[in-house]
């Protein structure tokens, strides 16, 4: 059974930082590109970031709205993917999901950016 479990969300002030984690099980994690996607009432579902495989030198790609502020990383030995978020803005508020190429999704973790 494939499982993805996100954690690390919560309330943070504008300009603050937060790190999200996602632990995977039930598949060979190192063989899959991983993504972070977020959902908000205002913007709907929005792709945030992608990290590829060791064979791709762990190449990363980002949505323009988060470029320079967010960093995606992975640890294949821990079957985990991370999202470091800096200089957070109100518009970053939403439920953040990790996905395996959009085939499998976690339950999400809520990030609220508010003073």
UniProtKB/Swiss-Prot annotation:
Name by which UniProt lists this protein? Ig heavy chain V-III region J606
Which controlled-vocabulary keywords does the entry list? Answer: Adaptive immunity, Disulfide bond, Immunity, Immunoglobulin
Q: Which Pfam families match?
A: V-set
Superkingdom of the source species: Eukaryota
Q: Which GO terms describe its biological process?
A: immunoglobulin mediated immune response
Q: Name one GO molecular function term.
A: antigen binding
List other remarks. Answer: This chain was isolated from a myeloma protein that binds inulin.
Disulfide bond found in the keyword field: yes
Enumerate the spans annotated as Ig-like domain.
1-114
Cellular component terms per the entry's GO annotation: extracellular region; immunoglobulin complex
In this UniProt entry, which cysteines form S-S bonds?
22-98
Asked whether the UniProt record includes Endoplasmic reticulum among its keywords, one would answer no
């Amino acid at each position: 059974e494939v499982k993805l479990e996100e954690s690390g969300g919560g309330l943070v002030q504008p300009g603050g930082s937060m790190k999200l984690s996602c632990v995977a099980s039930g598949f060979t994690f190192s063989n899959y590109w991983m993504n972070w996607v977020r959902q908000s009432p205002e913007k709907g579902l929005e792709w945030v970031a992608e990290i590829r495989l060791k064979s791709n030198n762990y190449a990363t790609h980002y949505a323009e709205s988060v470029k320079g502020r967010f960093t995606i990383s992975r640890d294949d030995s821990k079957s985990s993917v991370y999202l470091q978020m800096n200089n957070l803005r109100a518009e970053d508020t939403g439920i953040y999901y990790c996905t395996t190429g959009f085939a499998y999704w976690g339950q999400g973790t809520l990030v609220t950016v508010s003073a």
